[in-house]
C-alpha cells in the first residue's frame, strides 16, 4: 500500500511540474497579456516567439525542456530513495528494481499531460514538444538527440514548427524501437509521440490546406 501511495504522490508532483505554465507566465510578466488570446492560442515557445519575441521564447523553451528533464531525474531519485527506505520494511512480492523503468515511463507521461493540460490554465496548455524533448534527453539521450536533429533539419528546410515537431516525434518512435531500450521506455515514447501528434490536430488540418504559417509569420 505504501508503495502505491508513494507512486501516486510522485506522479502528482510530476504532473504539477509539467503544469507550470511558463509561456502563460511570460505573457503576464512581460506584457500583461493572456497569451492564449493571441497568435495560435498556445502557451508553447512558438507562440511566445510570435507574440513576445525571441528572448522570452528562448527562456520558455529552456524552462519547458528542463521540466521534462527534471521529471525523469526526479523519478529516478524518488524511486531510488523509496527503494532504500523500503529496504527496512517487511518484504513484499514486488521487485522494486525491475519497476524503475515503469516509474520513469509513467512520470514522463505525467509531465507531458501536465504541460498540455495544465491544472492552472483550466486544462489548456502547449503541445508538449519541448517537455517531451526534455524527457527523451534525460531518459535516453541518443533518442532525444536524434529527434532534436531531425527537428532542426526539418525546420531549416520547411520553416514550419508543427511539421518539424511531428517529424521529430515519429523519429523518436523509430529510434526507441530500433535501439535496445527497455519496454517501458518504448511504450512511453510511442504513447508520448502519439500524444504530441494528436495535440497538433489543428496544425495538420492547416498543413493539408496549405495555410500553416511558417516561422516568422503571424499564426
UniProtKB/Swiss-Prot annotation:
Annotated membrane-spanning segments are 1-21, 55-75, 93-113, 135-155, 160-180
- Which GO terms of type biological process are on file? phospholipid biosynthetic process
Localization: Cell inner membrane
Q: Which domain of life is it from?
A: Bacteria
Per the record, what are the reactions this protein catalyses? an acyl phosphate + sn-glycerol 3-phosphate = a 1-acyl-sn-glycero-3-phosphate + phosphate
What metabolic or biological pathway is this protein involved in? Answer: Lipid metabolism; phospholipid metabolism
Does the keyword Nuclease belong to this entry? Answer: no
Give the principal location in a single coarse category: membrane
Q: Which SMART domains match?
A: G3P_acyltransf
What keywords are annotated for this sequence in UniProt? Cell inner membrane, Cell membrane, Lipid biosynthesis, Lipid metabolism, Membrane, Phospholipid biosynthesis, Phospholipid metabolism, Transferase, Transmembrane, Transmembrane helix
A GO term from the CC aspect: plasma membrane
The kind of enzyme this is, by top-level EC class, is transferase
Offer an example of a GO molecular function term for this protein. Answer: acyl-phosphate glycerol-3-phosphate acyltransferase activity
Question: EC number(s) per UniProt?
Answer: 2.3.1.275
Q: How does it sit in the membrane?
A: Multi-pass membrane protein
Recorded hits in HAMAP family, A to Z, give:
PlsY
Assembly and partners are described as: Probably interacts with PlsX.
Q: Of which family is this protein a member?
A: Belongs to the PlsY family.
Q: Give the function comment from the record.
A: Catalyzes the transfer of an acyl group from acyl-phosphate (acyl-PO(4)) to glycerol-3-phosphate (G3P) to form lysophosphatidic acid (LPA). This enzyme utilizes acyl-phosphate as fatty acyl donor, but not acyl-CoA or acyl-ACP.
- Please identify the protein, giving its name as recorded: Glycerol-3-phosphate acyltransferase 2
Q: Provide the species name.
A: Rhizobium johnstonii (strain DSM 114642 / LMG 32736 / 3841)
The organism's taxonomy opens as:
Bacteria, Pseudomonadati, Pseudomonadota, Alphaproteobacteria, Hyphomicrobiales
Amino acid at each position: 500500500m505504501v508503495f502505491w501511495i508513494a507512486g501516486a504522490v510522485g506522479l502528482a508532483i510530476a504532473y504539477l511540474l509539467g503544469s507550470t505554465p511558463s509561456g502563460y507566465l511570460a505573457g503576464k510578466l512581460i506584457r500583461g497579456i493572456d497569451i492564449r488570446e493571441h497568435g495560435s492560442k498556445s502557451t508553447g515557445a512558438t507562440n511566445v516567439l510570435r507574440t513576445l519575441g525571441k528572448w522570452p521564447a528562448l527562456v520558455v523553451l529552456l524552462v519547458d525542456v528542463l521540466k521534462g528533464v527534471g521529471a525523469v531525474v526526479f523519478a529516478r531519485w524518488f524511486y531510488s530513495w523509496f527503494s532504500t527506505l523500503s529496504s527496512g520494511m517487511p518484504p513484499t512480492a514486488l521487485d522494486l528494481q525491475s519497476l524503475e523503468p515503469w516509474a520513469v515511463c509513467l512520470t514522463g507521461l505525467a509531465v507531458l499531460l501536465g504541460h498540455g493540460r495544465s491544472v492552472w490554465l483550466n486544462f489548456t496548455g502547449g503541445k508538449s514538444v519541448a517537455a517531451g524533448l526534455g524527457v527523451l534527453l534525460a531518459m535516453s539521450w541518443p533518442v532525444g538527440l536524434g529527434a532534436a536533429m531531425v527537428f532542426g533539419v526539418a525546420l531549416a528546410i520547411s520553416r514550419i514548427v508543427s511539421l518539424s515537431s511531428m517529424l521529430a516525434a515519429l523519429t523518436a518512435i523509430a529510434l526507441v524501437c530500433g535501439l535496445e531500450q527497455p519496454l517501458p521506455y518504448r511504450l512511453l515514447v510511442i504513447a508520448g509521440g502519439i500524444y504530441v501528434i494528436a495535440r497538433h490536430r489543428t496544425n495538420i488540418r492547416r498543413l493539408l490546406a496549405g495555410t500553416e504559417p511558417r516561422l516568422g509569420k503571424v499564426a
